[in-house]
Each structure stands twice: as C-alpha cells, then as structure tokens.
Amino acid sequence: MDPRTNPYAPGAGTIPPELAGRDEIIEKASIALDRCRNGLSSRGLFLVGLRGVGKTVLLTRISQEAEANGFAVVWIETPEKRSLPALLIPTLRTALLKLDKMAAAGDLGKRVLRVLGGFVGAMKVKYRDVEFGVDLGNELGVADSGDLEHDLAALFTEIGKVTKEKKTALVLFVDEIQYIEEEQFAALIMALHKCAQNQLPIILIGAGLPQLVGQAGRAKSYAERLFEYPTIGPLSQSAAREALETPAAKSNVKYEKDALGEILLQTQSYPYFLQEWGKHCWQYAKQSPITLNDVRSATELAISELDASFFRVRFDRLTPGEKKYLRAMAELGSGPHRSGDIAALLQKEVQAVAPTRATLIGKGMIYSPSHGDNSFTVPLFDGYMKRVMPNFNKLF
C-alpha cells in the first residue's frame, strides 16, 4: 500500500497515532500534577520499564498536557557522563523567564533568577561541564555554597515560592533518570523532599529502566515514600490490537484476525515493536485486509530493520567481553538468569565476570530483577544476540 499514507510511527519517543492502553497512567499523572498545584499532598512518579515500552512517549504526552494546562515545564534527558546541574540550568532558566513574564510576577520572580545565577556560579566551579554564558546576577548567600545537596534544595525552595505565588507548579520531567550519578540523584531527591515538606508546588515525573527503583532507594531511603513507581510493560492484547487497528481503519484498511494474532505473537505486544510491524505490514501488503501471509513476510523485513538499527546501536556500544556475557545470557533464553549460570556457561568464576555484569548494568543493557538474577533491558534482545553471534561455541 502507499507508503506516503503509512500511519505507523516507530521511532525514539515518537508518539504513535493511537496511544492505546495508557489512559490510567496519564490520568494518574494528571491527578498528581493538579494536587501539587493546589497545595495538596502528591507524590512524583517514576515510570519504570524496559526499552521499547513507550516511557518517553508517555513523558512527552504528560508534559504536553501539563504545558497546555498552565504548568511550568522543565524537560531534561540524562545521557551518561553529564552532570545534573549542566542539564538543569538551561531549562530552568527558560522556565523561570516564562514565569517572570506571567501576571503577578513581583519581586520573587526577579529574585529567583538571581538565585539561579548564584547557583550557576557555584556549580561552574564544581562541575566542569557546566557552561552557561548569560549573567543572571546573584543573590548572595542563597544556593551558592558549592554543595549541590544544599544549593539545589535552596534553589528549588525559591522556585517553589514563585510557582506558589503564581498559583501554578513546576513540573520536572526527567527521561533516562537512571543515568544520574548517585550523589547528584540524592541531591535531587532531597530538594524535592524539602519542597514537599514545605508544601511548595514542584513535582518530578521521571522515567527509567527497572534498576531505577533500587537506585532511588540507595540514594535516599525515603524515596519510596516520595514517589510512586508504576511499571510500564507491554500492552494488553486488546490495547495492542487497538494500537494496530485504529490507525489503519482511518484509511479503511483492516487486518484479518489471524494476521493480528501473528503480530501480537512476534512483538509480544511491546509498543515500539507494534509500530515497527505495523509499518512493514502496511508497506508489504498490496491491499486490505492485511493477511497472515503479509505479516509473515513483513516480519522478515521488521526483524532486518531492527537488527540494523534498534538492536545494532546498542550492540555497537559493547566491548568484546560484554558481548560474550550477553551472548551467554541469550544461550540460556530470554531470562532472567542466575549470575552463576551465566558464569558457568562462560567457563569462569562468578567473581571473574562480576565487573562485566556491573558495566552492563551501568550501560543500561541488563538489570537485576532480584539478587543474583539478570535480565535484558531490551525486549527480544536474546534473539538478536543469537543472530549476530550465531555460534556460541566458537567464542571459546
């Protein structure tokens, strides 16, 4: 069928044409934001899940609705090896300038910009990647000590006073939050805790891989009471069918029942893969309805494209030792797998491969669902490892 009218949208954080099965989490976030703005107790959210489940899509949709409803929105994505201040400062400045232009700005709006200026100066000394050329002035003695935990709490307190005065709330959206260094993560959690204690309207909506739950608890023990951790998983079968059928129906295209069943089987109902299969089914099929044979042919195309992009970009970041570790996991199946079983397959002691396991967790390739267990963070990655490294025995 015509590729120009293909409705499916596989992509990193691309909102699909039909955001099916996620109404409950969107409503949960909306309630939390409204309660925060109204001065009521509310917990932030950490959306937790594997790659390809649509965490970034949800953050984007929630942030769009927040901005449309008058919230002050700050969005950051936390790549590896960037400091939290370097990521926060530019986006906070933009949000504060918008707040300063709102009605009832008062002296607090000017003051908080000066406080941010002092924070910038202090962080430039401590973190080499903080680069900010605009002079905002400073408010001597506030958020300028150089101690991140103290200064971030002071900065957020001043911001909270402004948002409270203007009857709004600052919503901090943080994607890939698991990459924040633990000491900096602790400072962020403490700053938000301080705001919650003082009923100041600042709230965090974050997203990350499953290890985020443990990371937050290690950073600050009270994080479990400050945030909720909804799990974002594959879609239900009905939602998965809706994600495929609704966009197609707008162009009068239908799927045969067994064709839909085959897509759900191949994708395991993961949102990203549903979009990928939908795209290739549309492009392969000659006409409506899309048949089982169309899906089987499209499956080969979808897997080939995933191997060349979605999977490959992650594989290319790995060292030879890390590739062997993941290939051993794949040999055992989709997981989870005991560290001892992986080590035995690699013909090594558990302690010998522990550093490799640690770096793979740090890179976001695997996580530990329970002590001593290991699972892939990327769905279907075990199949890819077998395709890209087909002969496990030749690794030795």
Language model features: what each stretch is:
Residues 41-61:
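Walker A/P-loop nucleotide-binding motif
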Residues 211-227:
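Short regulatory helix/loop adjacent to the ATP-binding pocket of P-loop NTPases
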Residues 1-43, 394-396:
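A short, basic N-terminal segment
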Residues 63-82:
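Conserved catalytic segments around the Walker B and adjacent sensor/switch elements
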Residues 139-210, 218:
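Conserved Walker B catalytic segment
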Residues 5, 43, 258, 296-300, ...:
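C-terminal leucine-rich, beta-strand-based interaction scaffolds used for sensing/assembly
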Residues 122, 240-309:
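Amphipathic alpha-helical "lid/sensor" segments that cap RecA-like P-loop NTPase cores
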Residues 107-153, 157-165:
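Conserved P-loop NTPase mechanochemical-coupling segment
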